């Protein structure tokens, strides 16, 4: 995927009190949270990071007296030091007018947990202001402090490092299907699903003021945004190239920042308002009932209950491949547990296997991880018994979370519903 968003200088961590932050990840992590890691892994990592920041803060306070510097370098992430794989976080503060403010060092209070509820809850999401993920964060946690992140994995890291208390990330769309990247990240990281929210999506074709759609040569947006508007773009008779970028609002920001007049973006009406663009076509999604499902992630799971509808998400694998899937499904069917989703993803640890169990021959099958959502709480005995039976057939089983279902009613998306603002 080609990223058109401007890059930022890595290797610094800065903040501004009581402001939102943009988190940028430079480089790749050399160590990720594996399947078999425990919750103590990230707890100890956060403690190590806090200790390093505290010691560096003392040393930098001495040097700042001589050179006036107000930022410093965090040389380790997740407690892992040195090496080319070190990943740095670059926090760029900004206010509602999108202007960069004076930088201040990141304090230990920024790595401490925020209250569970209320206006101080810090919620990470992927994208920039105006993204649908920001709207989902506002719907899930009204009056929260939104923390934009440039990549999905950075949102996971923000919660693991206590920079954010929650992350709100999309997992599937009613038109575009599953966001496979986030399913892989759910397995790689040790965060827990603590809730879900369904957001109606209302796409607009937006461009700089005065631009006519007849003169467009390119349309940019998130891959899901392009897929959800493919037929409508064709019906409009636009002979344009489709180009994927990291997020919908980021596409609008890129056009505005670079004054590009031959390119339009697929984004929300709020993104057009934020970045000073005009709406050329309104409601261009192929289906008016376009909904994206987001999950809320936290460091600790919530306590399952039975006083309201709950949903549980699991992931499992078996060394014999798909032949056990029928047995797994039967464990839920016999207990009248409804499944709402089944998703298969290649097993990265064992990508392929020989058909012959004696490891001879050339024919090969893919190994898969299976993600399942079912309508039951882990506080119910039928759910516990079902998973006990599933565990007999699988070589790996993990509960990603048991959480309240989003039962709010919604109607086909409209401009008013999508462009509403949130106190973030």
UniProtKB/Swiss-Prot annotation:
Keyword Transit peptide: yes
Recorded metabolic or biological pathway in which this protein acts: Amino-acid biosynthesis; L-phenylalanine biosynthesis; L-phenylalanine from L-arogenate: step 1/1
GO molecular function: arogenate dehydratase activity; prephenate dehydratase activity
Keywords: Amino-acid biosynthesis, Aromatic amino acid biosynthesis, Chloroplast, Lyase, Phenylalanine biosynthesis, Plastid, Transit peptide
Cellular compartments per GO CC: chloroplast; chloroplast stroma; cytosol
E.C. code: 4.2.1.91
Role, per record: Converts the prephenate produced from the shikimate-chorismate pathway into phenylalanine. Together with GCR1 and GPA1, required for blue light-mediated synthesis of phenylpyruvate and subsequently of phenylalanine (Phe), in etiolated seedlings.
Protein name: Arogenate dehydratase 3, chloroplastic
Gene coding for it: ADT3
């Amino acid at each position: 995927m080609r990223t058109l968003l401007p890059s930022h200088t890595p290797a610094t961590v800065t903040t501004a009190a009581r402001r939102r932050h943009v988190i940028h990840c430079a480089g790749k992590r050399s160590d990720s949270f594996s399947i078999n890691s425990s919750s103590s892994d990230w707890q100890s990592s956060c403690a190590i990071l806090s200790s390093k920041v505290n010691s560096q803060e003392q040393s930098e306070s001495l040097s700042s007296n001589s050179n006036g510097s107000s930022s410093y370098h965090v040389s380790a992430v997740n407690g892992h030091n040195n090496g080319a794989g070190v990943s740095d976080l670059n926090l760029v503060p900004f206010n509602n007018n999108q202007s960069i403010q004076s930088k201040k060092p990141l304090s230990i209070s920024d790595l401490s947990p925020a209250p569970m509820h209320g206006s101080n809850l810090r919620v990470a999401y992927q994208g920039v202001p105006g993204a649908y993920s920001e709207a989902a964060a506002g719907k899930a946690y009204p009056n929260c402090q939104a923390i934009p992140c440039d990549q999905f994995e950075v949102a996971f890291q923000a919660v693991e490092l206590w920079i954010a208390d929650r992350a709100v990330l999309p997992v599937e769309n009613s038109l575009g299907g599953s966001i496979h990247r986030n399913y892989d990240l759910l397995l790689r990281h040790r965060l827990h699903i603590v809730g879900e929210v369904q957001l109606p999506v209302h796409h607009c074709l937006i461009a700089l003021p005065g631009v006519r759609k007849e003169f467009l040569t390119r349309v940019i947006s998130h891959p899901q945004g392009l897929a959800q508007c493919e037929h409508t773009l064709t019906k409009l008779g636009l002979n344009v190239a489709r180009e994927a970028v990291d997020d919908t609002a980021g596409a609008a920001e890129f056009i505005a920042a670079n004054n590009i007049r031959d390119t339009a973006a697929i984004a929300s009406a709020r993104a057009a308002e934020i970045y000073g663009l005009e709406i050329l076509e309104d409601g261009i999604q192929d289906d008016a009932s376009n909904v994206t499902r987001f999950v809320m992630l936290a460091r600790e799971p919530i306590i399952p209950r039975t006083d309201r509808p709950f949903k549980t998400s699991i992931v499992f694998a078996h060394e014999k491949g798909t032949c056990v899937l029928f047995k797994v499904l039967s464990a839920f069917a016999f207990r009248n547990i409804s499944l709402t989703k089944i998703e298969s993803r290649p097993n990265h640890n064992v990508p392929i296997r020989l058909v012959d169990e004696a490891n001879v021959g050339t024919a090969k099958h893919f190994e898969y991880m299976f993600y399942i959502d079912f309508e039951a709480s882990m506080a119910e005995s039928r759910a516990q018994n079902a998973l006990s039976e599933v565990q007999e057939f699988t070589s790996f089983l993990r509960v990603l979370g048991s959480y309240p279902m989003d039962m709010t009613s919604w109607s086909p998306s409209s401009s008013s519903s999508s462009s509403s603002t949130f106190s973030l």
